[in-house]
Regions:
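Conserved NAD(P)H cofactor-binding loop of Rossmann-fold oxidoreductase domains
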Residues: 72-77, 217
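Alpha-helical segment proximal to the catalytic Tyr-Lys
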Residues: 108, 149-154, 205
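C-terminal helical subdomain
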Residues: 160-161, 175-207, 214-216
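Active-site helix of classical SDR
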Residues: 103, 137, 145
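Short C-terminal tail/terminal secondary-structure segment
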Residues: 208-234
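Substrate-binding pocket helix/loop in short-chain dehydrogenase/reductase
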Residues: 79-92, 177
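Canonical Rossmann dinucleotide-binding motif of NAD(H)/NADP(H)-dependent dehydrogenases/reductases
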Residues: 2-31
Length: 234
């Protein structure tokens, strides 16, 4: 399905990003990864405009068209007590500005039937304390998704995925960690990669501007103290 398709994955050296990149490669795609971590991929900090320009130039020096862009790179997570102005701006640069600018750099080089997937988070709709930088960035990329879908109408489909608890080490949990999930388990990177490959395929050709939350049902579960055995402990 993806033989010889040109795929870009930001933050593709580890975790969900690496799983996505590996799955595309397994189906014959040519995958270009950018990540801060050293490796055989393009190494750079996507918060820097010049880095994104250099990366896009390298990709376009090898290919006329790009079929898939996966904006996956992870913004930092700091809360209101410890997050500085600079930290917050950095999180937004990685999580919102970089996805916008990378698409802008490549928008005139999108192949017919191109697809863009933005990796958000279930934190785009719910929060824990002291997560403001990450939550704001993930909310931003979710909103950016439907804006891009409209602006790129006829040129690319743009969708976002909001993962819940995804254990990148593929740990198998039991007890409360698993039972609390309506799906009965904690997620793993393949849960996200499978949806990415579906959304980028012709089978999803009538889906654009959408957000799909893959969280085992956690965001749909109402929890009150004393209900169903749940107790608030302080």
């Amino acid at each position: 399905m993806y033989k010889d398709k040109v795929v870009i994955v930001t933050g593709g050296a580890n975790g969900i990003g690496r799983c996505i990149a590996d799955e595309f490669r397994s189906q014959g795609a040519v995958v270009h990864v950018i990540d801060k971590q050293e490796g055989e991929h393009f190494v750079g900090d996507i918060s820097q405009k010049e880095v994104l320009e250099a990366f896009a130039s390298e990709v376009l020096s090898k290919h006329d068209k790009v079929d898939v862009i996966i904006n996956n790179a992870l913004p930092l997570m700091k809360g209101i007590d410890e997050c500085s102005y600079e930290d917050f701006q950095y999180a937004l640069s990685v999580g919102v500005t970089a996805p916008f600018y990378l698409v802008k750099l490549l928008k005139n080089h999108l192949a017919e039937g191109a697809s863009i997937i933005n990796i958000s988070s279930s934190r785009d709709r719910m929060s824990q304390p002291q997560t403001e930088s990450y939550t704001a960035a993930k909310g931003g990329i979710a909103a950016l998704t439907h804006a891009l879908a409209v602006s790129l109408s006829g040129r690319a489909r743009v969708n976002s995925i909001s993962p819940g608890w995804i254990d990148t080490a593929y740990t198998v949990y039991d007890g409360p960690d698993a039972i609390q999930q309506p799906a009965g388990r904690v997620g793993n990177p393949m849960d996200i990669a499978n949806m990415v490959l579906f959304l980028c395929s012709d089978k999803a050709g009538f889906i654009t501007g959408e957000n799909i939350c893959i969280d085992g049902g956690m965001t749909k579960q109402m929890i009150y103290h004393g209900d169903g055995g749940w107790k608030l402990e302080k």
